[in-house]
């Protein structure tokens, strides 16, 4: 009986010593959790602070284009450009239409007028203007309905018009993916050439996107259909998101 009392007394003394050591170090049992929570909160504040300080934060972006912008049969809220805008709390305007060309008028085919004309209808105020197109122009040329020279002349007019409409905005273009079809490579080359003449940055999605349009297995995973060579699904947009984000941050 006396031995049990001594054991209890020793346990009580050790418990008091342990508590005093914790208090001397400025930590309580609940303080351990509080310290962890503070570290996590500080990390979140650092992340948020980085977003607040980013050049995109709170700015207005007009995105004009074809189904790469409209996002075809899926909501445009899944598109990489919308996701980037959301991350940086941007005012996002989507001016995408399925089937639209940069230069060629497809009104007779029920796909509407080109960006060369439609850009005038966009809101006049924007900090960023992102143009995504060329896929339908390449198809139009491949079908013999337009020429590469017409495309170049029209694109030159579009660039001059955008600069006049948005003299203070940051302009940029994104080319089509590397589609294994006639005229796509030539159209991409013209986009880079004409935009280069006006010092407008271009993201060459045919060479730097990491989007392997020609691979059937890849398309099954990241496109809206196994035979689709234009439209990313939600996973595809997530895959491309970081590259698009870096491009916009660097404008």
Report each predicted region and the residues it spans.
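Conserved beta-strand segments of alpha/beta enzyme cores
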Residues: 91-93, 170, 199-201
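Catalytic His-Asp segment of secreted/periplasmic serine-dependent ester chemistry enzymes
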Residues: 108, 178-251
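N-terminal-biased segments
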Residues: 29-48, 135-158
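N-terminal secretory targeting modules
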Residues: 1-64, 68-76, 85-90, 122-126, ...
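Active-site segments of SGNH/GDSL-like serine hydrolases
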Residues: 135-136, 159-191
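Solvent-exposed, polar/charged alpha-helical surfaces in well-ordered, non-transmembrane soluble domains
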Residues: 78, 82, 86, 149, ...
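Conserved SGNH/GDSL esterase-like catalytic core that processes O-acyl groups on lipids
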Residues: 57-63, 68-148, 153, 182
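Conserved beta-strand termini and adjacent loop/short-helix elements that scaffold enzyme active sites
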Residues: 95-97, 174, 205-208
């Amino acid at each position: 009986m006396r031995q049990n009392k001594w054991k209890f007394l020793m346990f009580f003394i050790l418990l008091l010593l342990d508590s005093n050591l914790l208090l001397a170090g400025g930590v309580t049992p609940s303080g351990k959790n509080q310290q962890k929570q503070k570290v996590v909160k500080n990390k979140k504040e650092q992340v948020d602070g980085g977003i607040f300080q980013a050049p995109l934060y709170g700015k207005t972006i007009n995105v004009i284009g074809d189904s790469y912008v409209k996002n075809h049969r899926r909501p445009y809220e899944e598109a990489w450009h919308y996701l980037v805008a959301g991350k940086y709390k941007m005012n996002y305007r989507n001016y995408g239409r399925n089937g639209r060309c940069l230069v060629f008028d497809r009104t007779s085919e029920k796909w509407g007028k080109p960006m060369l004309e439609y850009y005038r209808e966009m809101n006049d105020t924007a900090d960023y203007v992102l143009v995504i197109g060329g896929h339908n122009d390449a198809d139009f040329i491949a079908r013999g309905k337009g020429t590469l020279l017409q495309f170049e002349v029209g694109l030159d007019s579009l660039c001059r018009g955008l600069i006049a409409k948005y003299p203070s905005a940051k302009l940029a273009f994104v080319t089509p993916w590397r589609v294994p079809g006639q005229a796509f490579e030539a159209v991409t080359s013209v986009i880079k050439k004409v935009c280069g003449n006006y010092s407008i940055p271009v993201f060459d999605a045919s060479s730097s996107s990491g989007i392997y349009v020609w691979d059937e297995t890849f398309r099954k995973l990241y496109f809206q259909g196994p035979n689709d060579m234009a439209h990313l699904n939600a996973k595809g947009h997530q895959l491309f998101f970081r590259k698009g984000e870096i491009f916009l941050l660097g404008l």
